Amino acid sequence: MRPAKRIGKLTTARVTAVTNDQGTNAKIVAAGTVPWRIKSGQLQVLLIHRPQYDDWSWPKGRLDPHETLPETAWRETKEEVGLRLTLGIPLGVIRYKTSNGNNRKEVWYWAARVIDQRPKPDANEVDETRWASVEEATKLLTKKLDKKPLKVLAEAYEAHHLATIPFIVLRQAKAIPAESWTKDEVDRPLADSGYTQAKAVAKLLRGWAPTRIVTSKYTRSLETIAPFVKKYGGAVRNKKWVNLRTVKAHPNFMAKRLRTEFKRHEPTLVCAQPSVTKRILKEIKSWVREDRHAVVNPKHVYTEKKSNLSPGSILVVHRATHLSGKIVSVERYEPYVN
């Protein structure tokens, strides 16, 4: 597939208190992170030096074939500085024309916290890394545009929005049609295209590394999460409140259990049937409204047309670890499937 056409297929929507990113609008698209840590009570960020350009910037790179933007950001950070990080809140997009002036380029950024890891430059594209305070980084960065994600990160830190825990909602991948299945509905499996979606979403989920995985006992839901669990691990929990019958019979119970899962202090993934994910999204939408000062323009993620997820797609909600526990970002993505 031609790069421009491939990029045009990306489904991306992200909102935070200060960013609002809707889809791609450039021939060249890249993604990266601003790695950060707290050292002696001070916020520090990790910059990289690229010998080819003799500049200081952030870990980033262009999309590989069959990648989504979050996957690119995660992979490039691992390749350039040897860090396996969990993606945090979005830090916006920088846009500019390439040096020859013929093409528009976008770079999508995420915050990524570093805990108990030491950066290792790849000695090819990156020959040096340096931890710096926000003030030092502002002076050290070569390109003015690279200061934009740093500014967003610093503002999030001051607002207690930077340290977060991801909560992910995954709609099960495409199942074979109900009318063509004669056995127990619980055992209805994924379609061939659904298995392909499940493998693709496993790569996408890697960026947030959920360790607790909640799903129903339905075969198609279990098959959706199977590729991720097999490759990356995670504790799978079969819960009745995720079953459609339970949700229909006891909607308040579902809402209560959902809130309990959301408040856990570990990255959590909930995988469910389409009717259930639609109700989950409706519930989360009400939480976003309650925390509306922390997320701007949630309508770009929640509209009538976007009231549910497509098969195999995800909603990522970040909750601040600060005492307020506010929702500080909402993102939705589809896995890349040929």
Question: Which residues are covered by each model-predicted region?
Answer:
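Nudix hydrolase/Nudix homology domain
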Residues: 2, 54-55, 119-177
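Conserved N-terminal beta-strand and adjoining loop/helix that marks the start
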Residues: 8, 13-45, 166-168
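Short, well-ordered beta-strand micro-motif
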Residues: 35, 47-49, 109-113, 131, ...
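Conserved Nudix-box catalytic region and its N-terminal flanking loop in Nudix hydrolases
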Residues: 41-84, 181-188, 193
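Active-site-proximal alpha-helix that buttresses catalytic centers in soluble enzyme cores
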Residues: 61, 72, 162-249, 278, ...
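Unchanged
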Residues: 63-89, 94-145
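Generic beta-sheet signal
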Residues: 166-168, 264-272
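A short, acidic, amphipathic alpha-helical segment used as a generic capping/interface helix at domain edges
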Residues: 249-266
